Amino acid sequence: MQPIIGGDGYDTPLLLSVGGKGANDVYFSTHAYMAADSTKPIQAFIKAYNAANKTDPENAFAALGYDTVALIADAITRAGSDDPAKVKDALAATKGFAGITGTISFRPGVRVPDKTATIIGVKDEKLFLAAQVTPSFVPAP
């Protein structure tokens, strides 16, 4: 069987529940590996999310949203103000922000962050962490 490659839209429980054996050899990029055997920050996030919501996060978008709020809070702190222009400058100067989904940095003049991407695979109808990479090139949106 040929592998199937997809994007973060594949990051849904439906991939396994609907796909069954047909989901084997699927690989997709997403923002974090949301499993019990993931990183300690992700495990802690899943535990806190479950405590607050009585369910696990459906996919990595919850963790990415958490990182987004944390990144903005960090930028406000570094800016010493919530003035939008100062926060924008602080965001643009972000280097090595340790988010739970990976490290986030911005390059001068580029509004798309350098961030870790997670590649998830399916084998025996189970998700596994295939790779984590930081792309050296990200095309403009």
What are these regions (language model features)?
Residues 1-141:
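Extracytosolic ligand-binding ectodomains
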